Amino acid sequence: PDASGKLVGFDIELCRAVAAAVLGDADKVKTTKMNLPTSFGALQAGEVDIITHRFTWTFSRDVGTGMNYTRVMVWDGQGFLVRKSLGVKSLTELGGATFCLASGSTTEANAADYFRTHNMDFKSVTFSDMKAAAQAYNAGRCDVYSTDKFGLGARRLTFDDPSEHVILPEV
């Protein structure tokens, strides 16, 4: 929100554009905060009309949920954030590490796939959403926080000392 409490940013502006086009008034927007698992169900149940958030497009979500995805709006990849003090330079050095992840997310599935493919162990510590996972990482509950790379950069700025965290080069 801005100083007056009005929501700002890409997602809310997209909502306002849809409201203007469909309802003739950009201010006829009612927002509801939800996490990934509840938002898809709410859309399918007709509790909300659209979801605007940086959800990862996957083929199974596109064809298996009965929902219509728009075009991809941001092209990104999964990233990994670690504390500089670990001295880690690559994802390949994270065998046995603990990861703070959002439960049920593509981030969780991708991490599991990567470590299984590379015959490496890791421990997944899951949370209800990305914000909770980031807060747990910042509090020292995990070695690694993972989400989309552009999200990592933004989230890192909210940490106690952003300069103490580094985004690994792998995507």
Show where each model-derived region lies:
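Short, well-ordered beta-strand segments
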Residues: 1, 51, 81, 98-102, ...
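Short loop->beta-strand "edge-of-pocket" segments that line small-molecule binding or catalytic clefts
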Residues: 1, 8, 92-108
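Acidic, polar ligand-binding/catalytic clefts
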Residues: 6, 16, 20, 24, ...
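Short, hydrophobic alpha-helical packing/hinge segments within bilobed ligand-binding/sensory domains
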Residues: 14-15, 38-43, 133-136, 142, ...
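Short beta-strand-to-loop elements that line the ligand-binding cleft
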Residues: 26-35, 101, 120-130
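Conserved functional loop/turn residues at catalytic and ligand-binding sites
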Residues: 47, 98, 141
